């Protein structure tokens, strides 16, 4: 500061003693002699310390604050229930009354962690923890007491180097192109507890896997191989949930009894201009357990597993705003009469045959504009030689061509702060229909609110007969930080 004051005084004195020079500088430019030079060694007396810290932040982040930057935490309170008072016609069994009732009332914490802790290394994990409040079906099943539960969604470490990428830990592997309705999307098991989850994308469960991805030098083709080190199966429905049907006995988990179960598969994918194709093969276990009735001295059913081989092909093609999808699956040695309605378990049937199955799914995605999108997916499957091995009078639960269809529409409004979505889903035999509409509103960077309406209709004999004329409403308030 002293040096600056001295410099200011010198300039003031110069202006008083040499006014003519100042006026000349204003009237015409001063032209220096071309022989004039400056000595770079001259010390003008500037104090460099005055600039230290001028552009630095006032305070550095603590190690704890930097560590928390890798976390994303979402806290949500959700409530939903069946709102329509009605009765279900069960034919010769009479009618079953259904009253409006609150089904879910819960506080959920979602925690996600992702850290690129070194070049080529990534650690990622996510989990949720729930508190079930009064009138939630988990609360009722717990003897009218608050219940808590936590679950690890995924936790893996990834190493990428050159053309190779390795991932080890709990993760999901998704095959197929048809969105939400692919016959190839059967690697990971899933859990449909209630009607708060109706999309397979939200129902998938992670498993302990090693995944190796190899990319060619042009990035036009890749080879992906997985090994499932501990195959798991669809959990039995939670007692008391809307999707629980009491069979009169317990549905336990499969007892491995020292058995080593492993799944493995590989997929080759090739990209062309505007399209992709893929070939895949895998050795898998059916995700849905099959239960035989319990023995006379035990209340527990006897779960059984079945392994099979899968061969698949998938392709897509982009034409303007339209993306066409196609999947083909051939399954060898699957259980022919396995009952696998989402959220329920396979109950024993008098027919216990293993057959080959051919399935296909196809559809399209259409981008109406930058905010609107619509997609259609149709899945159809059939058993090959379905009558072979059947005794006179026997028939399969799934005979002929069976499958489902799915239509989705989404629209982002108000610069993406307001999102509307609609889903229609039914079976190919036109026995049931589910209609879902959702509205999500982002209040600010932290707060958001969402609402859902689910309407269902089903004919007699459908797996969804018990939910005919159900109308479910739900709302969720979320805080993210």
Which residues does each predicted region cover?
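Residues on the lipid-exposed face of transmembrane beta-strands in outer-membrane beta-barrel proteins
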Residues: 109-115, 154-159, 210-214, 266-270, ...
């Amino acid at each position: 500061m002293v040096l600056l004051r001295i410099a200011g005084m010198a300039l003031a004195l110069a202006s008083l003693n040499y006014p003519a020079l100042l006026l000349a500088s204003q009237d015409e430019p001063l032209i220096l002699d071309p022989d004039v030079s400056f000595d770079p060694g001259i010390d003008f007396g500037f104090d460099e310390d005055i600039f230290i810290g001028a552009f630095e932040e006032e305070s550095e982040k603590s190690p704890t604050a930097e560590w928390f930057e890798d976390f994303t935490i979402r806290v949500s309170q959700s409530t939903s229930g069946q709102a329509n008072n009605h009765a279900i016609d069960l034919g010769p069994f009479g009618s079953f009354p259904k009253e409006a009732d609150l089904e879910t009332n819960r506080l959920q914490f979602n925690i996600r962690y992702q850290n690129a802790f070194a070049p080529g290394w990534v650690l990622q994990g996510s989990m949720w923890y729930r508190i079930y409040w009064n009138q939630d079906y988990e609360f009722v099943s717990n003897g009218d007491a608050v219940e808590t539960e936590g679950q690890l969604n995924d936790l893996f470490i990834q190493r990428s180097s050159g053309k190779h990428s390795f991932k080890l830990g709990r993760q999901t592997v998704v095959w197929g192109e048809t969105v939400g309705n692919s016959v190839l999307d059967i690697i990971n098991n899933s859990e449909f507890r209630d009607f708060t989850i109706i999309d397979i994308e939200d129902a998938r469960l992670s498993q302990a896997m090693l995944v190796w991805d190899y990319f060619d030098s042009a990035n036009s083709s890749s080879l992906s191989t997985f090994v499932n080190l501990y195959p798991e199966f669809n959990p039995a429905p939670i007692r008391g949930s809307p999707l629980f049907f009491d069979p009169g006995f317990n549905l336990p988990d499969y007892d491995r009894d020292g058995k080593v179960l492993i799944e493995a598969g590989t997929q080759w994918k090739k990209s062309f201009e505007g399209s992709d194709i893929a070939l895949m093969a895998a050795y898998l276990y059916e995700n849905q357990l099959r239960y035989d009735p319990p023995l006379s001295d035990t209340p527990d059913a006897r779960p059984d597993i079945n392994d099979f081989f899968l061969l698949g092909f998938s392709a897509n093609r982009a034409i303007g705003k339209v993306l066409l999808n196609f999947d083909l699956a051939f399954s060898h040695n699957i259980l022919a009469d396995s009952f696998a309605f989402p959220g329920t378990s396979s109950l024993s049937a008098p027919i216990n045959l293993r057959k080959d199955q051919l399935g296909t799914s196809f559809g399209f995605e259409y981008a109406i504009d930058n905010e609107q999108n619509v997609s259609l997916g149709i899945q159809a499957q059939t058993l090959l030689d379905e009558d072979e091995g059947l005794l006179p009078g026997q028939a399969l639960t799934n005979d002929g061509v069976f499958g489902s269809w799915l239509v989705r529409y989404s629209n982002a409004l108000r610069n993406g702060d307001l999102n509307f979505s609609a889903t229609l889903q039914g079976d190919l035999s036109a026995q049931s229909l589910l209609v879902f509409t959702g509205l999500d509103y982002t209040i600010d960077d932290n707060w958001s609110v969402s609402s859902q309406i689910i309407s269902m209709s089903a004919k007699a004999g459908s797996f969804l007969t018990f939910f005919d004329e159900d109308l479910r409403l739900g709302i969720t308030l979320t805080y993210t930080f």
